[in-house]
Amino acid sequence: KFNKNLSNQLNFDEKIFWTKVKNFDSKGYFVTTFDSSEPTLKFANKPYIINAKFFDHLPYHPYTIDEVKIIIENIYGINFKEPPMKYWPEIRDDWISSIFESRSNEEWLELSQKYNLSGIIVPSNWEIKINEKVISEKYILYKLQ
């Protein structure tokens, strides 16, 4: 007997949102948050630049440290050597929301060009200075390409 996997359940609004994200013609990575990393990959089949929920792989794959440092500092705006919370392998929304919201459209487009970013998926109450977007009750996709 199989049990129903509740983690695969989406309400109607979220199902529409993730279908739109999935159908978004993109070739780059997506910047995600603590809560949007997993569904970006799971429901939209889109690659994230880093899993903001956890990146505890560094001790096992030290050759990735330089790239992770660049992503965390340049895209997420967090000091790699002095993070808000030491020994915490995640990026919390409250650490980055004001950084993301304070960037101009031009700054986001520069990051998009430099790091091959197609979009940003954040909680729906964040206001990022990008016009083209897809909105749901829970998330917003800001399109960069």
Briefly describe each language-model feature range:
Residues 3, 90-94:
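Short glycine/proline- and acidic residue-enriched helix-loop micro-motifs
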